[in-house]
Curated annotation (Swiss-Prot):
Family: Belongs to the neurotoxin 02 (plectoxin) family.
Keywords: Disulfide bond, Knottin, Secreted, Signal, Toxin
Tissues and organs where the protein is expressed, per its UniProt entry: Expressed by the venom gland.
GO terms under cellular component: extracellular region
Record's protein name: U18-lycotoxin-Ls1a
Species the sequence originates in: Lycosa singoriensis
Amino acid sequence: MSPKMQALLLLLGLITLLVVHAEEELSENTESERGCIKLNQECVQNKTPCCNNRPCLCYMRFNICLCEKPLGEIFGR
């Protein structure tokens, strides 16, 4: 493979990586602007909702509530 082709492929790979990273940051900003709580973050039931309609599950043993994945999301449904 020619050096020009290798440089072009490297450049395309870097651009793709930057676009994916920028999309992740944008989705995080959108969630925080909506006022929802991210996955595995502390939550209070019936207050600020968890993002993506995830449940706020409380663990009395540890005296903490967290936004968790629903069972369907855990098992890939």
